[in-house]
Amino acid sequence: MDQTKRRHYSQLSQQLQLLQKNLEATTQHVETMSVQCNEHLVNKLGKIQASWFIGGNRCFEQELLGKR
């Protein structure tokens, strides 16, 4: 193998190592984003459910007490 090929393989090896490092960082960021989105979604769904419950309860109270 001549010197030029060795140099190219060395550069390719360095680029592949950098690519692997960047892919690992990207994977960690995607996992963090996924956890945050899931937590946010569950939180939002909880608020929606609570709003429906409170609204339904108020309607029921108005009907029960005849306050329309």
From Swiss-Prot:
GO biological process, one term: positive regulation of attachment of spindle microtubules to kinetochore
Record's subunit section: Component of the DASH complex consisting of ASK1, DAD1, DAD2, DAD3, DAD4, DAM1, DUO1, HSK3, SPC19 and SPC34, with a stoichiometry of one copy of each subunit per complex. Multiple DASH complexes oligomerize to form a ring that encircles spindle microtubules and organizes the rod-like NDC80 complexes of the outer kinetochore. DASH complex oligomerization strengthens microtubule attachments. On cytoplasmic microtubules, DASH complexes appear to form patches instead of rings.
Cystines in this chain: none
Keyword Cell cycle part of the UniProt annotation: yes
Lineage per the UniProt record: Eukaryota, Fungi, Dikarya, Ascomycota, Saccharomycotina
Gene: HSK3
Task performed by this protein: Component of the DASH complex that connects microtubules with kinetochores and couples microtubule depolymerisation to chromosome movement; it is involved in retrieving kinetochores to the spindle poles before their re-orientation on the spindle in early mitosis and allows microtubule depolymerization to pull chromosomes apart and resist detachment during anaphase.
Coiled coil spans: 3-39
Keyword Cell membrane attributed: no
GO cellular component, one term: microtubule
Species this chain originates from: Eremothecium gossypii (strain ATCC 10895 / CBS 109.51 / FGSC 9923 / NRRL Y-1056) (Yeast)
Gene Ontology MF terms: microtubule plus-end binding
Protein name: DASH complex subunit HSK3
Keywords: Cell cycle, Cell division, Centromere, Chromosome, Chromosome partition, Coiled coil, Cytoplasm, Cytoskeleton, Kinetochore, Microtubule, Mitosis, Nucleus
PANTHER family the record matches: DASH COMPLEX SUBUNIT HSK3
Family the UniProt entry places it in: Belongs to the DASH complex HSK3 family.
Subcellular localization(s) per the UniProt record: Nucleus; Cytoplasm, Cytoskeleton, Spindle; Chromosome, Centromere, Kinetochore
